[in-house]
A protein has these predicted regions:
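Active-site/ligand-binding loops adjacent to catalytic centers
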Residues: 3-19, 69-161, 205-231, 235-238, ...
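Active-site/ligand-binding-proximal alpha/beta "capping" segment
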Residues: 9-74, 148-152
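Short, well-ordered secondary-structure micro-motifs
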Residues: 30-31, 62-63, 94-101, 200-202
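Buried hydrophobic positions in well-ordered alpha/beta secondary-structure cores of metabolic enzymes
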Residues: 38, 50-51, 83, 117, ...
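Beta-strand segments within the central parallel beta-sheet cores of soluble alpha/beta enzyme folds
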Residues: 48-53, 78-86, 185-191
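Short glycine/serine/threonine-rich phosphate/pyrophosphate-binding segments
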Residues: 54-63, 91-94, 165-173
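Catalytic phosphate/nucleotide-handling subdomain of diverse soluble enzymes
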Residues: 170-231
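Low-complexity, intrinsically disordered Ser/Thr/Pro- and acidic-rich segments
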Residues: 240-242
Length: 247
């Protein structure tokens, strides 16, 4: 929040074009390509439900705009795609507004591990609310524990290590399905927007530490075979003092 405010003040004073703040039209229009790529990867169809993490609010309304432009151009069928906003419970000003039926976003002080989406006063929050309303979607939030559990679930089932924004999206999608807002048998796009390497500290303490072994093939085989018998993955640190790990 403070950085966005400062960048806006700098742009006003010096006439500079700071590309990664919400008030730059070229930046926000560029976010539509995310929606275009979703349609392309779906074989030029739209998912019936798209869940997007919300920070400053730039991406979600532009995904919705991308969908509407594709529909108007006749490139995809209008299947009434719904858009959902996903936020951390410790910073959920947009979701709170959606639930309350308000257009006004009330700023919050972020308290969450999901730092990349911890924007307490989102500049484009109003447009997120409008896109969600127009599409017939909803807003959902997830606790820090739910976010971590979702990160682990995605890694275990899909081999994808996401940072907390993606964990938030998955956790919120699960809750939307369980609450009946998203049918289980319809197409769902879960937006995973960041790599877990950005926030390694989030999962530290939530996973088993690696087993250290000497740099011997027999020692490695023993650990792997033991893990296979137990039906578990085997994190291994090879060699004394080594930071190499093999799943």
């Amino acid at each position: 929040d403070d950085v966005n405010r400062l960048c806006s003040e700098i742009a006003d004073k010096y006439g500079w074009a700071i590309v990664n703040v919400n008030l730059r039209p070229f930046y926000t229009e560029g976010a539509k390509t995310f929606g275009f790529e979703i349609a392309e990867q779906y074989g030029w169809k739209l998912p019936q439900h798209t869940v997007v993490p919300t920070a400053g609010g730039t991406i979600l309304p532009k995904v919705y705009k991308a969908y509407q432009e594709l529909i108007k151009l006749g490139l995809v069928e209008d299947n009434g795609p719904k858009i959902y906003s996903a936020q951390a419970a410790g910073c959920n000003p947009v979701v709170e507004a959606i639930r309350a039926g308000r257009d006004l976003i009330k700023p919050q002080k972020p308290r969450t591990i999901a730092k990349s989406i911890a924007i307490g006063n989102p500049a484009d929050g109003f447009y997120v609310v409008q896109a969600v309303k127009q599409s017939g979607g909803w807003g959902e939030d997830a606790t820090d524990d739910e976010i971590v559990d979702a990160i682990k679930l995605l890694a275990r089932t899909e081999g994808i290590w996401t940072e907390p924004a993606g964990g938030t999206t998955l956790a919120c999608t699960i809750k939307l399905i369980e609450s009946g807002r998203i049918p289980r048998d319809e197409s769902i796009c879960v937006s995973i927007t960041g790599n877990g390497l950005k926030t390694v500290e989030v999962v530290q303490g939530h996973l088993e530490p690696p087993t250290s072994i000497p740099a011997k093939l027999a020692a490695f085989d023993a650990v792997v075979n033991g893990a296979r018998k137990a039906g578990q993955a085997a994190p291994v640190a090879v060699g004394a003092g080594s930071d190499f790990a093999a799943p």
